[in-house]
């Protein structure tokens, strides 16, 4: 992946749908933004939520780069997040349900090998290895439990577990992971290896490909762009308006609820003195959508509303 493609796709990821994501967060968990139990005002909390979302989007994009490369090598990614119900054990009233939540799963077959018996590579992704003793033990045990489930699902395949840390500068628990793997390997129980940074791509003999991505990441960081730090205006953002028009009825009723917390939301994020506020536009457009007999009538009424708004400007 060349840098121009990297930056273009990252720019798109960091600027698409930001207002919509923020709107959903506010509706689903208003107490995070309006609560007497936290000292910050709503603007600070909105900014925190927005920047946290941007950071998560950034990491997801880095994961996407890895997926892109792996598929370019000819591997097919399989479903990596799902729930699996274990067989009911004696004495249990209900069977245990395990959530498999890997970053990637793909088959790794030898040259000329059979797809059905190919090794199943299961990748767990973390930003950096900074965990304390209790945390790392919990992380290890959770991954092992998921790998045991995957061995049930793929009884004819070897399960290869991998914990990949993106940041190559922190190796706090490398000895712990190596010791656990050696012990598990000797008893032929499911285990996983820890890899750091470009080391993971040695599996494909393509370490230089990830080193190139790491260089792209550093170049983007050193450019000090700030366009993705500006929080969208929920009162005027076009994507937010479209999201409001298409909100399910439960979420919409929350947003227009007379409850104090939602009244505060409307007061702070919408300009209730402006008839062109997204709030009032959404009210009108949702009504048109609800009462129109067909798509043609809906389009006609929306056009009439837009023409009327233009005449009043």
Segments from the language model and where they lie:
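Domain-level recognition of nuclease-like catalytic cores that cleave nucleotide substrates
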Residues: 157-313
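Catalytic cores of nucleic-acid endonucleases
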Residues: 113-121, 125-187
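Beta-hairpin (beta-strand-turn-beta-strand) motif
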Residues: 83, 107-109, 128
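Short secondary-structure capping micro-motifs at structural edges
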Residues: 51-55, 88-92, 108-111, 146-151
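Active-site beta-strand-loop-beta-strand hairpin of nuclease catalytic cores
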Residues: 96-122
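Interdomain/boundary linker segments immediately adjacent to catalytic/signaling cores
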Residues: 1-74
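A short acidic/basic microdomain associated with nuclease active sites
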Residues: 71-97
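Phosphate/oxyanion-binding active-site loops and adjacent basic polyanion-contact surfaces
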Residues: 58-62, 97-98, 135-139
């Amino acid at each position: 992946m060349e840098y121009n493609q990297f930056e273009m796709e990252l720019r798109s990821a960091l600027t698409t749908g930001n207002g919509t994501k923020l709107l959903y967060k506010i509706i689903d968990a208003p107490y995070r933004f309006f609560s007497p139990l936290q000292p910050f005002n709503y603007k600070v909390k909105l900014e925190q939520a927005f920047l946290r979302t941007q950071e998560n989007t950034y990491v997801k994009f880095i994961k996407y780069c890895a997926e892109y490369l792996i598929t370019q090598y000819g591997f097919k990614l399989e479903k990596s997040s799902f729930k699996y119900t274990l067989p009911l054990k004696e004495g249990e009233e209900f069977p245990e349900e395990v959530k498999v939540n890997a970053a990637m799963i793909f088959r790794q077959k030898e040259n000329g090998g059979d797809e059905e018996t190919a090794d199943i590579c299961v990748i767990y992704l973390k930003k950096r290895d900074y965990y304390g003793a209790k945390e790392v033990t919990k992380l290890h045990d959770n991954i092992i439990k998921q790998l045991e489930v995957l061995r049930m699902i793929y009884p004819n395949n070897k399960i290869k577990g991998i914990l990949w840390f993106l940041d190559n500068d922190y190796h706090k628990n490398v000895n712990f992971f190596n010791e656990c793997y050696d012990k598990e390997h000797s008893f032929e129980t499911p285990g996983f290896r820890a890899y750091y940074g470009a080391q993971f791509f040695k599996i494909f003999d393509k370490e230089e490909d990830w080193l190139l991505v790491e260089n792209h990441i550093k170049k983007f960081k050193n450019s000090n762009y700030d366009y993705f730090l500006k929080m969208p205006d929920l009162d005027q953002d076009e994507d937010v308006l479209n999201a409001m028009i298409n909100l399910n009825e439960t979420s919409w009723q929350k947003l227009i609820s007379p409850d104090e917390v939602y009244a505060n939301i409307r007061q702070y994020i919408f300009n209730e003195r402006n008839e062109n506020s997204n709030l009032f536009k959404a009210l009108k457009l949702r009504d048109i959508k609800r009462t129109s007999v067909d798509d043609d009538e809906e389009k006609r009424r929306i056009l009439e509303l837009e023409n009327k708004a233009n005449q009043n400007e």
